[in-house]
Swiss-Prot record:
It is found in: Nucleus. The keyword Iron does not apply. Its EC number is 2.7.11.22. This is Probable cell division protein kinase ECU08_0230. The lineage of its organism: Eukaryota, Fungi, Fungi incertae sedis, Microsporidia, Unikaryonidae. It comes from Encephalitozoon cuniculi (strain GB-M1) (Microsporidian parasite).
């Protein structure tokens, strides 16, 4: 660890902390995700999955894993330092075209699903933006590769406000559509700067969803009233937030709409 000069604590979670640091060899700022290792249990399964998934991903809109440092007591994942969380960047750049960021977010999610990865915790706090406007999906601690068939999965994934109704109702066998629901919530929030379903409990969250998105018609009316956006954006949001996951739009279908209306990634 002598290569890195530790700086400020950026965030913390169940297994460890994330620090700002300086790479003394490159002189660049990096982010260090440090995970404490238990003598009896060893490396947490979430860390193993995160490393395995990140190693196979390579995309402009996905955070890259620079290196791993492993000692008896500590596992450190080294990432590029990304300047802003999504909402802070949008707040600082209100005059800029939000659709450019929406496009990048969709491109990142489409790539993940093409690589058989379900993120399972898409939310604004896990989406970062560089100072020159490049969006990066981050924090793959809850992610799963569907190439490894190990259902049932936990339904206690995805932060409450972005959790799909089937997860709220306890589903343990699910696929990419749980990310698509989160994507719809995030796109809405990127445009309005307000969460669509700010529930206080699982029960309250389901009540909010049923009230606002119980049918496509009611949801479309609400979105059209609140958002001054092109029709295709409304269509993407509404179809992402279909209560019936079997009817929910896929990342491939969203990309088709984008390519026709906005341009490819």
């Amino acid at each position: 660890m002598t290569r890195y000069i530790l700086g400020a604590l950026i965030g913390s979670g169940t297994y460890g902390e994330v620090y700002e640091a300086i790479d003394t060899e490159t002189k660049e700022k990096v982010a260090l995700k440090r995970i404490r290792l238990n003598e009896k249990e060893g490396m947490p399964g979430t860390a193993l999955r995160e490393i395995s998934i990140l190693k196979k991903l390579s995309h402009r809109n996905i955070i890259s894993l620079v290196s791993i440092i492993h000692t008896d007591a500590l596992l450190t994942m080294v990432f590029p330092f990304i300047d802003y969380e999504l909402k802070k960047y949008i707040g600082m750049n209100t005059g800029k075209n939000i659709m450019e960021l929406v496009n990048q977010l969709i491109c990142g999610v489409h790539y993940l699903h093409r690589m058989n990865v379900v993120h399972r915790d898409l939310k604004p706090q896990n989406i970062l933006v560089t100072s020159d406007g490049v969006l990066k999906i981050a924090d793959f601690g809850l992610s799963r590769s569907l190439e490894i068939r190990v259902p049932p999965y936990s339904s206690e994934v995805v932060t409450l406000w972005y959790r799909s109704p089937e997860l709220l109702m306890g589903s343990t066998s699910y696929r990419f559509y749980v990310d698509i629901w989160s994507l719809g919530c995030i796109i809405y929030e990127m445009i309005t700067l307000e969460p669509l379903f700010p529930g206080e409990s699982k029960e309250n969250q389901l009540t909010l969803i049923r009230r606002k998105a119980g049918t496509r018609r009611s949801l479309r009316g609400m979105v059209e009233q609140r958002l001054a956006v092109p029709k295709f954006v409304t269509e993407i949001i509404v179809r992402c937030l279909d209560f019936n996951y079997n009817q929910r739009i896929t990342a491939d279908e969203i990309m088709e709409i984008l390519e026709n209306e906005y341009g490819a990634c």
